[in-house]
Design a protein with these regions (language model features):
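Terminal, low-structured helical/coil segments at or just beyond the last alpha-helical repeat
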Residues: 23-47, 186, 195-202, 208, ...
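Alpha-helical segment of the N-proximal tetratricopeptide repeat
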Residues: 45-82, 86-96
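Position-specific recognition of the canonical hydrophobic site in helix A of tetratricopeptide repeat
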Residues: 58, 85, 89-92, 109, ...
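Structural signature of tandem alpha-helical TPR/SEL1-like repeats
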Residues: 60-72, 93-106, 127-140, 162-174, ...
Length: 274
C-alpha cells in the first residue's frame, strides 16, 4: 500500500469519527453493544477511502488530480455511473468539454435514469451553444426528477439563450419556488452542474429581478435590478410600469435602484416614489 493511500485511509477514518465521540470522557461502566458501535465505527475500506480522497481533491479544486483518482477506481468498476459522472464534472471544470461529455454519456448508458448525469450533459451542450439540445436534455432530466431546482434553473438559462423568454420566466419561477437562493449559489464541485453563464447578462438579470418580484422578494429584486442597470440594460426602468413588479415596486430598496438611472438610460426622468 502506497503512502498516499495510507494517508487517504487515515484521513477518511478521522473524518468518519464523530467529533462528539472523540471528546466523550472515559466511562468505567461496561459499554453496551450500541455504545461500542458508536465508539468503534467501522473503518472505511480502501475503495471507499480512495473515492473520498478524490472527492477531497474536487473540493480543493484540484480537478486533474481528482479525475485521475476517479479513473483509477473506474479501472475495476467501468460501469459505475456515479463515478463516471464525477469524472465528467472534473473534466468540465478543467474546460475539457469533449471529455466531460464522453463520461456523461457513459454514465447515462450505465444508468438511463440518472438525472444528474443527463443534466450535466445538458450543461456541456449549453456551453457549446447547442441550446436546443440542452433544452431537450434538461427536460429529460426533469421527467425523471421533478424536485431539482438546479435543473429548472439550467432549463431557464437555455430558454433564455434560445430567446424563448416566456418559457424562461416560467421556468425560473419554478426554480425559485423550490429554492429562493438558487441564483446566488456557486456552480460548486458537486455531482450536479449549475449553469453560470448567459448570452446577455443585463437582460438576464432583469428577468431574474422580475422572477423575484413576482415571488414578492423585494431585497433580491433590488439586487438583480441593480446588476441589470450596472450591466447596461437600457430598459431596466421599465420595471416602474411592469405589472410583474407590482408587489415590490414601492419597497424603498427597489425605489433606490430606480432613482439612480445611469447615463445610458436615456432621457427618462427620475421618478419619485408612489
Amino acid at each position: 500500500m502506497s503512502q498516499s493511500t495510507r494517508f487517504a485511509i487515515a484521513l477518511a477514518f478521522l473524518i468518519a469519527v464523530p467529533a462528539r465521540a472523540q471528546q466523550t470522557p472515559v466511562s468505567f461502566t461496561k459499554p453496551t453493544q450500541a455504545s461500542e458501535a458508536v465508539a468503534n465505527p467501522s473503518p472505511m475500506t480502501p475503495r471507499q477511502a480512495a473515492e473520498m480522497h478524490a472527492d477531497i481533491m474536487m473540493a480543493r479544486k484540484e480537478y486533474e488530480s481528482a479525475a485521475g483518482l476517479y479513473e483509477k477506481i473506474l479501472q475495476s468498476e467501468p460501469k459505475n455511473a456515479t463515478l463516471l459522472n464525477k469524472v465528467g464534472v472534473a473534466y468540465q471544470q478543467l474546460g475539457n468539454l469533449n471529455k466531460a461529455a464522453r463520461y456523461y454519456k457513459k454514465a447515462i448508458q450505465s444508468n438511463k435514469s440518472f438525472a444528474s448525469a443527463i443534466n450535466n450533459f445538458g450543461t456541456v451542450e449549453y456551453e457549446k451553444k447547442h441550446f436546443g439540445k440542452s433544452i431537450g436534455l434538461y427536460k429529460k432530466a426533469l421527467a425523471l426528477r421533478v424536485d431539482m431546482a438546479t435543473v429548472y434553473s439550467n432549463l431557464g438559462y437555455a430558454y433564455f439563450a434560445n430567446k424563448e423568454y416566456p418559457k424562461a420566466m416560467d421556468t425560473f419561477q419554478k426554480a425559485l419556488a423550490m429554492d429562493p437562493g438558487i441564483f446566488e449559489k456557486k456552480g460548486g464541485n458537486g455531482s450536479v452542474v449549475q449553469q453560470r453563464t448567459t448570452t446577455d447578462p443585463g437582460l438576464f438579470y432583469f428577468f431574474v429581478a422580475k422572477a423575484y418580484a413576482q415571488a414578492g422578494d423585494a431585497e433580491r429584486t433590488a439586487h438583480y435590478l441593480k446588476l441589470s442597470r450596472d450591466d447596461g440594460y437600457v430598459e431596466f426602468l421599465s420595471a416602474q410600469t411592469d405589472d410583474a413588479f407590482a408587489r415590490v415596486i414601492k419597497d424603498p430598496r427597489v425605489q433606490e435602484v430606480l432613482q439612480v438611472p445611469p447615463s445610458y438610460a436615456g432621457p427618462t426622468k427620475k421618478q419619485g416614489s408612489n
